[in-house]
Amino acid sequence: MTRDLEYNITAQDNGVTISDYLKKQGFSHAVTVQLKKIPESILLNGKWEYMGTSLNGGDCLFIHFEETESSENIVATNLPLSICYEDEDILVVNKPADMPIHPSMNNYDNTLANAVCHYYQTQGIPYTFRCVNRLDRDTTGLTILAKHLISSAILNSEVSVRGISREYLAIVKGFTEDEGTVNAPIGRKEGSTIERQIDVLHGETAITHYKRLAYQDGLSLISLKLETGRTHQIRVHMKSIGHPLIGDFLYNPDFTKINRQALHSYRLRFTHPVTKKPLVFTAPLPEDMQALFPEMIL
């Protein structure tokens, strides 16, 4: 997979080196190392230059990047793939339930990575799988995939400064407050490699905002926005205030209404890693959650 990028340098970057300018654009150290291995990957006003060369207003910086290898140890598998958006830099997918993001010992060929690698293999395009916002196996909805190392680096830097806004929909037990915020650190539960818990002493900062959208038959449909992205954050936080997600095999194993955790990645807002245009994507409630609130159209 190849990508050519062009940057028109303004006066405010007079004297800035190419290396520092690329860092400012979100290029990681791994990207710059890779660029050094590619012939004529960095052209300034049509001529090859070193990373330490200084820029001037009016300069044209051209970046050529290419990846010729695909992800190792990921079997290309023909699985359903719901693509919401695709361009040269990113892929936005609406992930179904019962699909892990990455392969593991017990999930060798049934993951999103397998499906996406098959999608590009059939087109003859080398592709390395890079997921920006990971979802649990049974969480449905939107996830962003980077199509090359540059977009991956830029998007991950946005994640680190909370530049990607994520909104979820969940169905929880009981009648919640109209809205609220859970600010409670999360850490691993002792004796478990999977389960998390509120851990005031050793946990990492975690903040979740929620708002009730509807109530029916002892269940609340809520929207949630995250300030942080801890493992199982929504599931642990909602349980901690007495409103666990229904169908959650770890934190509330009650499958009378639904056979998986009722959690859906509903909306993503972020800046495109290359064009810098604002992007917004939404994915409607999946059928199993919609069936519990049939009158709610989101």
Locate the predicted segments by residue.
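Short aromatic-glycine motifs in intrinsically disordered, low-complexity regions
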Residues: 193-201
